[in-house]
Each structure stands twice: as C-alpha cells, then as structure tokens.
Amino acid sequence: MKNYSKNATHLITVLLFSFVVILLIIPSKCEAVSNNMQPLEARSADLVQEPRYIINVPPRCPPGSKFIKNRCRVIVP
C-alpha cells in the first residue's frame, strides 16, 4: 500500500506543478494576442510608405534592335 501512496503523491505533485506552469504561461499568451488585436489602421500606419511614382520606361534592347509593341525586335536592313 505504501508504493501506491508514493505514486499518488508523485502524480499530484506533477499535476500541481503543470497547473502552476499553465497559469504562468496563459496570461503572457493573452497579452501577446491583445497587442495583436489593435485596429488595422493603427498597425498599418507604421508600414505605410510614401507612394512611389511608377514611370513606364521601356527596357533596353541590344544593339541593332528596337522596342516595338512591348518587345525588342531586330530590324533587318
């Protein structure tokens, strides 16, 4: 009977320890989630950069060819 009580004591100790660890971990996880729950405008305000002006510049073609209809075409003399 002594062996069973020793196992039960060990089991209760392990369960209590894991319960305390869970109580310590859960609040930190909830805090991280609440920080992430800010409105999208507040979070994306830091990420917004000034708009870049896109200039449509045709690609450079190799010598002897011209850019015609979105492609480099070889001009035959």
UniProtKB/Swiss-Prot annotation:
Tissue and organ expression note: Expressed by the venom gland.
Main localization category: secreted
Keywords, in A-Z order: Disulfide bond, Secreted, Signal
Residues of the signal peptide: 1-32
GO CC term, one of those recorded: extracellular region
Propeptide: 33-52
Name of a matching Pfam family: Secapin
Disulfide bridge map: C61-C72
Top-rank taxon: Eukaryota
InterPro entries: Secapin
Locations listed in the record: Secreted
Family, similarity comment: Belongs to the secapin family.
Protein purpose: Nontoxic peptide.
Name of the protein this chain belongs to: Secapin
UniProt source species: Polistes hebraeus (Paper wasp)
Upper lineage: Eukaryota, Metazoa, Ecdysozoa, Arthropoda, Hexapoda
